[in-house]
Amino acid sequence: MTKSLVTGGAGFIGSNLVDQLIKIGHKVIVIDNEYSEAHEQFYYNDKAEYHNLDIRDDATRSLYDGVDYVFHIAAEARIGPSIENPTETVSINSFGTCTVLQFAREAGVKRVVYSSTSSAYGLQEPPHVEALPDDCLNPYSISKVNGEKLCKMYTDLFGLETVIFRYFNVYGNRQPIKGQYAPVIGIFLRQLENDQELTIVGDGEQRRDFVNVKDVVQANILAATKKLDKDALGQVYNVGSGCLLYT
């Protein structure tokens, strides 16, 4: 049986991925310390094996033994908290990613799929193609891009296969809708539930690319399990719909 490990597997994107991996017959191990500024709750699948641990903890090392694929989603995933506590954000997102990669390398994992962010493009005008230079404007985005560089380095230097995804605005089943750091779709849903007007920040000319979590899950599984050319490994790929909507 194929064995997959998902970091952050009890959160929004991770829990959807866990469910689909189990559905297609994978044995799934989850590392999640249930810490998030955005999630009002966490989600569990009875058929998965859960470990309430920090990805930086050496106690997670043995969990990688026998694992085929690692899906690294765990992160401090909001800009606001990263500005309030940049050192912790960099520790989780950069050092934490290095720890995941090192443990995966030591265990002989076949491939690591890394979840990064379109925030790496900063305020550059669309289209946001992968060839654009990084424009990191906050600790969150730069810490995630550091993780990207680590993935490429582990591929080039150590031969650990990695694939890097930059997600745009992910929405769908289990998305956070509460708290000051909820994403924009969650905020809109919360306002609709409370019969409030939708809040538009700025002049209303902002455009965003929204991608359904089902598509993100499918991209992760394909990236992990399909044969890829050597040149495709350690590279960054956008995951979005390709359509810009005014928000």
What do the predicted segments below correspond to?
Residues M1-V170, A224:
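N-terminal Rossmann-like NAD(P)+-binding domain of SDR-like oxidoreductases, especially those catalyzing
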Residues A10, E34, G204-R207, G242:
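Short donor-sugar binding/catalytic loops of nucleotide-sugar-dependent glycosyltransferases
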Residues G108-V112, G159-E161, E197, D203, ...:
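Active-site loop of short-chain dehydrogenase/reductase
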Residues L137, F168-A182, G202-K214:
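Glycine-rich "substrate-gating" loop/helix at the edge of Rossmann-like oxidoreductase active sites
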Residues V170, G186-T199, R208-Y237:
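Alpha-helical substrate-binding/gating segment
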Residues Y246-T247:
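Conserved small/polar residues in nucleotide/adenosyl-binding loops
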